[in-house]
A protein has these predicted regions:
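Short alpha-helical transmembrane segments in multi-pass integral membrane proteins
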Residues: 1-23, 77-141, 181-243, 301-362
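Transmembrane helix-bundle signature of multi-pass secondary active exporters and lipid flippases
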Residues: 21-74, 243-303, 328, 359-366
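Alpha-helical transmembrane segments of multipass membrane proteins
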Residues: 35, 39, 150-154, 176-181, ...
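Short helix-loop-helix connector
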Residues: 45-46, 84, 121-123, 156-159, ...
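Residues that define the loop-to-transmembrane-helix transition and helix capping
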Residues: 49, 87, 132, 161-162, ...
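Small-residue-rich hydrophobic transmembrane alpha-helices
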Residues: 53-104, 148-156, 275-329, 333, ...
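Short runs within selected transmembrane alpha-helices of multi-pass transporters and secretion channels
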Residues: 70-77, 137-156, 164-172, 194-210, ...
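Long, acidic/polar, low-complexity amphipathic helices and coiled-coil-like
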Residues: 91-93, 158, 166-173, 180
């Protein structure tokens, strides 16, 4: 079996690179959707209101609801060793996705939304109704992400990382198609165009992941012999394994609603929230190289003498992305990105550049965080 042969060889940095690259490209394709959304919404009617509605309402709420399913990718990569473990994890994924989707519906379609947005986030009144519409359109978001991350973990474990990149390409193409329709033909409200594009993209990616993973499930997964003991995927063991991972992503993603609530209480709140999606989008483009490392570490550490090569690769990658991000922040490239590509007003663009200074260490730190996190998950 290919998997067994790969594990028998000593790992070199080149091996880590070729394992990481498809995932990194996948994350970059996914990261491109937020700048694309910002660029289109900024060119439709009332861009200040609709960008702020997405950045200050829809995005932080949808992200925090989704947070518990983020680490299904790591769990699937680590635990889906055979048909029995696949079936157990599939049930857990469906329960989590369904429960969190129900929570999303309760927030988006009941007065709970008003309490959270007005009282907790303290959002400017102008963005409340557009944000409500956007949250309702984003209803498929959590379940589809849970499903595709679970399937992508299986793809990574059985040596088909390139399928993750293909899925991200499907997502981006769908996203751009909806954005193009909204901008060139319909010219509707920016919040509707943007959130419809995001929801359609993740749904298309989940469908592709389902189709692409079926041959693996019916083939390699059924006959898998990883050389490792069977994973204990009983409910109690799974919760003991997964709850720390879910709490990690929850704590990390809590930064978004906490940051939104803080910004909404400061001077120039509406302007800051309008610039926020473009700032987050650019930072995410640089951080995704580190976010894609976690599953590579988990998979590589099962091979002999791999720790040194993976660790050295992680340190070099951290230095590289830090230098690349600093180049954008400390030169006119940053201002040019916000004005020419994102179509922000000069005042919003200057806000964005100032914000980037405070995030200079994040891309490199994200790489190192995922190197250590991958080791903990493997252990």
């Amino acid at each position: 079996m290919r998997e067994s042969c790969d594990r028998a060889a000593v790992v070199r940095q080149r091996d880590v690179l070729w394992s990481w690259l498809p995932l990194a490209l996948s994350w970059m394709l996914m990261a491109a959707e937020l700048p694309a959304l910002g660029a289109v919404v900024a060119r439709l009617a009332d861009p200040r209101i609709h960008l702020a509605a997405y950045g200050g309402g829809v995005f932080p709420l949808a992200l925090i609801i989704e947070a518990p399913v983020i680490m299904l990718l790591s769990a699937s990569t680590a635990l889906c060793r055979n048909r029995a473990s696949y079936r157990a994890l599939w049930r857990y994924m469906m329960v989590m996705g369904g429960a969190l989707t129900l929570l999303h519906v309760l927030i988006a379609f009941t007065p709970l939304f008003d309490f959270i947005v007005n009282r907790v986030l303290h959002a400017p009144p102008e963005i409340v109704e557009p944000a409500r519409v956007g949250m309702r359109i984003m209803t498929p978001w959590t379940w589809t992400i849970a499903y595709r991350r679970f399937m992508q973990g299986i793809q990574i474990r059985f040596g088909h990382s390139r399928l993750v990149g293909f899925g991200s390409a499907v997502r981006l193409i769908t996203n751009l198609s909806v954005l193009s329709f909204g901008y060139f033909i319909w010219k509707g409200p920016g919040i509707i165009v943007g959130t419809a594009a995001i929801a359609a993209g993740v749904t298309a990616e989940a469908l592709f992941s389902h189709i692409a993973t079926r041959p693996i499930i019916n083939g390699a997964l059924c006959t898998a012999d990883s050389g490792l003991p069977d994973a204990d995927v009983g409910l109690r063991a799974f919760l003991a394994f997964y709850i720390p991972l879910a709490l990690t992503s929850l704590v990390v993603l809590l930064v978004n609603p906490i940051g939104t609530a803080a910004v909404a209480r400061m001077p120039r709140a509406l302007d800051s929230l309008a610039a926020w999606p473009s700032v987050v989008g650019l930072m995410f483009l640089f951080r995704c190289s580190g976010l894609s490392l976690n599953e590579v570490v988990i998979a590589m550490l099962e091979r002999p003498d791999s720790r040194s090569a993976v660790g050295q690769f992680s340190r070099r990658l951290s230095l590289f992305v830090t230098a690349a991000f600093a180049l954008v922040v400390l030169t006119p490239l940053g201002l040019g990105w916000f004005t020419a590509v994102q179509n922000l007003s000069p005042s919003h663009a200057q806000l964005g550049v100032t914000a980037l200074f405070f995030g200079c260490v994040l891309p490199g730190a994200t790489v190192l965080q995922n190197w250590y996190q991958g080791q903990l998950v493997y252990a």
